[in-house]
């Protein structure tokens, strides 16, 4: 929040100015004290409204569930409140958080990437698909508004910075879209037309089983509509009649046609079900990209979340 935000102007600067003016009018000799007191008030107000990063990588904290919005029969967006309305998670672009819960007498920990960003203060959103065998995802479905969840972070090897490469290719499957969405939003928000400097080109291959499985399709389509540097190619196992996207699994030919060719100034990001990621590692290697490591590092050409 800017020091000269409307909230600070109406809540600190104007009252302080009126206080000093009133003191000068009624008791001029106390004006220096009034000025000093007003300065303290303004400083406190501005500082207290400054966004505070609340994540702690070493300790779990409890955050209260504020809202639950069902996207489909098994996909929900969970909104968790931060302690103060001006608080932010403090999550670097490309990183994720850990959620923990005691299930069956044991503590279970899973990683998730928020679909919200630090531009949105006071809360964070998680898009979660409930799987039959998913411990934390099933636990979240039982969580009621007002109850808390244990959260720790940030974590992860990916920290996106503007123009870290010329062109990014992305391959996502299912809920693997969440870290991609976070990065795509950050890039487009930081375009020169928006006052930033990020000129990175982005191509996304997004694979799903059925049309209804395409998560955040409206949001992705809107981003692609407003930014000609971002393109999407959908792949479905069970496409509807008249489908013009990809069919079946993501193939090397699709990657070759849709994503940037191997080069020192590009990256390919992978996120999705383990069998898919494993297949994409082999496919990218066969196309001449640097072989993906078992555990990815930031400098890798092919990075797996």
Swiss-Prot record:
It is a single-pass membrane protein. This is NADH-cytochrome b5 reductase 1. It is an enzyme of class 1 (oxidoreductase). The lineage of its organism: Eukaryota, Fungi, Dikarya, Ascomycota, Pezizomycotina. Coiled coil: none annotated. FAD binds at residues 141-156, 167-204. Pathway: Protein modification; peptidyl-diphthamide biosynthesis. Its main location: mitochondrion. It catalyses: 2 Fe(III)-[cytochrome b5] + NADH = 2 Fe(II)-[cytochrome b5] + NAD(+) + H(+); 2 Fe(3+)-[Dph3] + NADH = 2 Fe(2+)-[Dph3] + NAD(+) + H(+). It comes from the Eukaryota. It comes from Aspergillus niger (strain ATCC MYA-4892 / CBS 513.88 / FGSC A1513). InterPro entries: CBR-like (IPR001834), Cbr1-like_FAD-bd_dom (IPR008333), FAD-bd_FR_type (IPR017927), Flavoprot_Pyr_Nucl_cyt_Rdtase (IPR001709), FNR_nucleotide-bd (IPR039261), OxRdtase_FAD/NAD-bd (IPR001433), Riboflavin_synthase-like_b-brl (IPR017938). SUPFAM superfamilies: Ferredoxin reductase-like, C-terminal NADP-linked domain, Riboflavin synthase domain-like. Keywords: FAD, Flavoprotein, Membrane, Mitochondrion, Mitochondrion outer membrane, NAD, Oxidoreductase, Transferase, Transmembrane, Transmembrane helix. Its cofactor is FAD. The chain crosses the membrane at residues 29-49. Its EC number is 1.6.2.2.
